[in-house]
UniProtKB/Swiss-Prot annotation:
The lineage of its organism: Eukaryota, Metazoa, Chordata, Craniata, Vertebrata. Plays a crucial role in the metabolism of thyroid hormones (TH) and has specific roles in TH activation and inactivation by deiodination. Catalyzes the deiodination of L-thyroxine (T4) to 3,5,3'-triiodothyronine (T3), 3,3',5'-triiodothyronine (rT3) to 3,3'-diiodothyronine (3,3'-T2) and 3',5'-diiodothyronine (3',5'-T2) to 3'-monoiodothyronine (3'-T1) via outer-ring deiodination (ORD). Catalyzes the phenolic ring deiodinations of 3,3',5'-triiodothyronamine and 3',5'- diiodothyronamine. Belongs to the iodothyronine deiodinase family. It comes from the Eukaryota. Its EC number is 1.21.99.4. This is Type II iodothyronine deiodinase. The gene is DIO2.
């Protein structure tokens, strides 16, 4: 099958789910608009903020791009885990905690690879996301619990990627005080700074190490993240591959996988 035929087939596969996502956003905008009008008529103070739509031309481009990333991702369940280039993000305490609990001094922007954090004896849970992605940030407390409960048998890595909803792009509507306002990353320093902003609000356990994707977004592309995704690497292979976010981003599946494979060892520890 030729390249053009493959591209056409992928496009035809994407179109139905793309339009269903657009329909969902249109319904969401309609509900929010109705709520806004009701509050306006009642002269509520809640209407002071500017109403912004989710279904915009910028939003549609982002959604389409996310499906392309998912369709062309390199990562496959049971196959070799892509060893993407990333950079260290130092913890608020000024260090990086290794898998054995020791503090290691790291500097923002120090180059490394994703599989540098993988151990032959322990699975590596990799969580991809950004501060401007509400489904990702809403699940960070649950992710922190996973780290605390299973750090004796597994390693954890958070990979900070391109912003899902930058303030100068497809911004999230609503009360800005509830969300992060981060602009599109112009350089690696911007991306590391955004990761620090996330860590300042969400205190992750020291056992979870944090890195940022390179500006070429190679980790995002290899793992087909787009907005958020979680996977588990074991012996350099993909042992678990979570679905495409936001609708199929599911940390409960990660918990079930860890409980199935390591619950007895956790109880002994």
């Amino acid at each position: 099958m030729g390249i053009l035929s493959v591209d056409l087939l992928i496009t035809l596969q994407i179109l139905p789910v793309f339009f269903s996502n657009c329909l969902f956003l249109a319904l969401y905008d309609s509900v929010i608009l109705l709520k806004h009008v009701v509050l306006l008529l009642s002269r509520s103070k809640s209407t002071r903020g500017q109403w912004r739509r989710m279904l915009t031309s910028e939003g549609m481009r982002c959604i389409w791009k996310s499906f392309l990333l998912d369709a062309y991702k390199q990562v496959k369940l049971g196959e070799d885990a892509p060893n993407s280039s990333v950079v260290h993000v130092s913890s608020p305490e000024g260090g990086d905690t290794s898998g054995n609990g020791a503090q290691e001094k790291t500097v923002d922007g120090t180059e490394c690879h994703l599989l540098d954090f993988a151990s032959p004896e322990r699975p590596l849970v990799v969580n991809f996301g950004s501060a401007t992605u509400p489904p990702f940030t809403n699940q960070l407390p649950a992710f922190s619990k996973l780290v605390e409960e299973f750090s004796s048998v597994a390693d954890f890595l958070l990979v900070y990627i391109d912003e899902a909803h930058p303030s100068d792009g497809w911004a999230v509507p609503g009360d800005s005080s509830l969300f992060f306002e981060v602009k599109k990353h112009r350089n690696q320093e911007d991306r590391c700074a955004a990761a620090h902003q996330l860590l300042e609000r969400f205190s992750l356990p020291p056992q979870c190490r944090v890195v940022a994707d390179r500006m070429d977004n190679n980790a995002n592309v290899a793992y087909g993240v787009a907005f958020e995704r979680v996977c588990i690497v074991q012996r350099q292979k993909i042992a678990y591959l979570g679905g495409k976010g936001p609708f199929f981003y599911n940390l409960q599946e990660v918990r079930r996988w860890l409980e199935k494979n390591f619950s007895k060892r956790u109880k002994l520890d």
